[in-house]
Swiss-Prot record:
GO terms for cellular component: cytoplasm. It is an enzyme of class 2 (transferase). Its EC number is 2.8.1.8. The gene is lipA. Keywords: 4Fe-4S, Cytoplasm, Iron, Iron-sulfur, Metal-binding, S-adenosyl-L-methionine, Transferase. It comes from Moorella thermoacetica (strain ATCC 39073 / JCM 9320). Transmembrane segments: none annotated. InterPro entries: Aldolase_TIM, Elp3/MiaA/NifB-like_rSAM, Lipoyl_synth, rSAM. It is found in: Cytoplasm. Residues 55-271 form the Radical SAM core domain. This is Lipoyl synthase.
Amino acid sequence: MVTSPSGTGTRRMPPWLHKRLPASGDIEATRRLLADLHLNTVCQSARCPNQGECFASRTATFMILGNTCTRNCRFCAVEHGQPEAIDEDEPRRVAEAARRLGLKHVVVTSVTRDDLPDGGAGHFAATITALRQALPGAYIEVLTPDFRGSRAALAAVARARPDIFNHNVETVPRLYPDVRPQADYRRSLDVLKQMKELDATIYTKSGLMVGVGESREEVLAVMADLRAVNCDILTIGQYLRPSPRHLEIKEYVPPETFTWYAQKGREMGFLYVAAGPYVRSSYHAAEFSVKIAGVK
């Protein structure tokens, strides 16, 4: 265990977190494509540490519904405030970008839009539909906000039939007031539960970040809660602080602990578990579709 000094969260990263940036012309080509189509990605907006690696392999996680979130989670680098109006042409442009990139597994996420009556569910559905038309053989994964628990909003997404529905619980319930003050742990579990009730053929997925003060026992309890609502896929990664104004890092979790979490997850019955320091919700997301769903 490597812990950060109390009150700083700035201890030097351990060796297992040192990462060499890839050298590839595809990084700039991917950035230009996204800029030309006026698209946001969570890779850029959330300052993801895997951005260079993903762009080098010509993949990206599209972020729809603007670049401004109505919530202010303490771990997240996405800007918060008053969001802009919905861009009705965005689904078409997302599909065009995915087609040009030649994606076989497309991941779409969004900011939280509590200002919209449906939370943006209709825009998710429109994006899924556009992707189906542009890339009939692609696997489509959506990572959504909680839509304030609205079953009608979730039903709109379910009717569009994504292959994977992802909603992250992010952390253990004890830490929600500090980490996700505007969210609710039980509501997030219920979102995953409702999606399975609406369409049992849609794979459900959730993710946790560790290193924010949780215990191993608390992580296992969350994993058990996720299995209780029939969650199929789990990701666990190290929280890395985007800036000094964000949530402090309490611990750098060693690789062997991630291996242990992955083994426990498989024992609990998850179809697929990705756990590691740099694992994020959509990092190497296509591995599930290849290994479990048979998409080549």
